[in-house]
């Protein structure tokens, strides 16, 4: 369907890295129905993901779609409450869909402070700026299309379009 409008399929891959749980950050689950928590989520979104190679901007509507729907129970904030993590556990894997706002330390340190001892690997819902130790790329199941007449950033290197920007 999309190719007849000039769009071409682009290969997308997701990063997975082994976990090394460290002293965990205590997290509080946030409730997107609570006005204070929703404001924190939006403020953190506006500060973006400091670890991401690229991110979605000016699309609070899509963020709220995920926050009020499929990711409702995966929203967490650290004690400082100046950031939001969208985290989902599946067996021994922690999916870090997004890290929004202000986080201290490197991505590797932050991820491993968000994991519990039972977690063996971490999957990212975004493309990190920096390489993670032991990272591997796995082909995604989603279908991504780019406009054929424009530059295709997915052709030159492996990327994962931020999960919370998938429409």
Where is each model-derived feature located?
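Short sequence/structural segments immediately N-terminal
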Residues: 2
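Active-site/acyl-donor-binding loops of N-acyltransferases
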Residues: 5-25, 98-101, 112-167
